[in-house]
From Swiss-Prot:
InterPro entries: MsrP (IPR022867), OxRdtase_Mopterin-bd_dom (IPR000572), OxRdtase_Mopterin-bd_sf (IPR036374). It catalyses: L-methionyl-[protein] + a quinone + H2O = L-methionyl-(S)-S-oxide-[protein] + a quinol; L-methionyl-[protein] + a quinone + H2O = L-methionyl-(R)-S-oxide-[protein] + a quinol. It comes from Actinobacillus pleuropneumoniae serotype 5b (strain L20). Part of the MsrPQ system that repairs oxidized periplasmic proteins containing methionine sulfoxide residues (Met-O), using respiratory chain electrons. Thus protects these proteins from oxidative-stress damage caused by reactive species of oxygen and chlorine generated by the host defense mechanisms. MsrPQ is essential for the maintenance of envelope integrity under bleach stress, rescuing a wide series of structurally unrelated periplasmic proteins from methionine oxidation. Keywords: Metal-binding, Molybdenum, Oxidoreductase, Periplasm, Signal. Heterodimer of a catalytic subunit (MsrP) and a heme-binding subunit (MsrQ). It is found in: Periplasm. Its cofactor is Mo-molybdopterin. One of its GO terms (cellular component) is periplasmic space. This is Protein-methionine-sulfoxide reductase catalytic subunit MsrP. It holds the Pfam family Oxidored_molyb. Its EC number is 1.8.5.-. Mo-molybdopterin binds at N72, Y75, E76, C130, T165, N217, R222, S233, I234, K235.
């Protein structure tokens, strides 16, 4: 797992201090929601604390939680970065069902509770790189997608894993009004190759910062693929289908010359309208505290994933 060196003290440094205090007191993970040792109490039941295995100890640069939950792309709730937090606050995620179907021997459905207790949860601290050339570092909570794939027992025909976001225009104003939702033909669809899905880095996340995902971050369950641009990490998933054929994904349909199927982070392949060689780091400061850094190949996960693309021309297959 990649490590991060803190170049500055951010508010989220309190997060690690807090965890050590909790453990020293002999309290469980539920204590992470307590308001008296560094964080304000959450009012929403959706944001209750989770039980999970901590990430390995380290000195990480974490993006402030308020930036992670307040600066989002989730066009189902509007195209402005602040719109998801504003318009998703009453989004209902329970009851919920996640259907597993297609080329599998064992199709099944998980309900809301089963999303959190079917597989052991663990924390993964990952870089997150948006195709818009900004980045964060986020402590996700979830489980390896490979665990779900193994439970489904894909057949030999299963070459791709397709993900579908909820389609509910009554709850998602961007689906009701195409202008408000960025002109997308909903529901949102993404996909991985079966090999990408089985990579140990690929995560199905149900939380961040020790709590359930907020609605604007893709509650109750979303994909996290840290070596790909953020639009591949589909949110609020209701169906996962195993297929023999590669689908055309949402952004691939909308603008195929700008957004390819693979969407691997690559500083050597620019977006048609901007460079991908560097990125703006979302930190604790405001607009005047902008920090840029060089973008790493595969977002810094080259050692773990480069073998998946051996022999593939990444400038053509972007």
């Amino acid at each position: 797992m990649n490590r991060f060196t803190r170049y500055d003290v951010t508010p989220e440094a309190i997060f690690n201090q807090r965890r050590q205090i909790i453990k020293a007191m002999g309290l469980g993970a539920a204590a992470l929601s307590l308001p008296n040792i560094g964080f304000a109490a959450e009012k929403s039941d959706q944001l209750k604390a989770l039980n999970f295995k901590d990430a390995p100890k380290g000195d990480f640069l974490l993006t402030p939680e308020n930036k992670v939950t307040g600066y989002n792309n989730f066009y189902e709730f509007g195209v402005d970065k602040a719109s998801p937090a504003k318009f998703a606050k009453d989004f209902k995620t329970d009851p919920w069902s996640l259907e597993i179907a297609g080329e599998v021997e064992n199709p099944f459905v998980l309900n809301h509770a089963q999303l959190f207790n079917t597989f052991p949860l663990e924390e993964r601290i990952y870089r997150f790189r948006c195709v818009e050339a900004w980045s964060m570092v986020i402590p996700w909570v979830g489980f390896e997608l490979a665990r779900l794939v193994e439970m489904a027992k894909p057949t030999s025909k299963a070459k791709f894993v397709i993900f579908h976001t909820l389609h509910d225009p009554e709850q998602m104003p961007g689906q009701k009004n195409k202008f408000f939702g960025g002109g997308i033909d909903y529901p949102y669809v993404e996909a991985l190759t079966i090999e990408e899905a089985m990579n140990p880095l690929t995560l199905l996340s149900v939380g961040l910062y020790g709590k359930m995902l907020p609605p604007q971050n893709g509650a109750p369950i979303r994909l996290v693929v840290p070596w790909k641009y953020g639009f591949k990490s589909i949110k609020s998933i209701v169906k996962i289908t195993f297929s023999e054929t590669r689908p055309r994904t949402t952004w691939e349909k909308l603008a195929p010359h700008e957004y390819g199927f693979y969407a691997n982070v690559n500083p050597n392949v620019d977006h048609p309208r901007w460079s991908q060689a560097s990125e703006r780091v979302i930190g604790s400061g405001g607009l005047l505290a902008v920090k840029r850094q060089d973008t790493l190949m595969f977002n810094g996960y080259e050692k773990e994933v480069a073998h998946l693309y051996k022999g593939l021309d990444l400038k053509v297959n972007f």
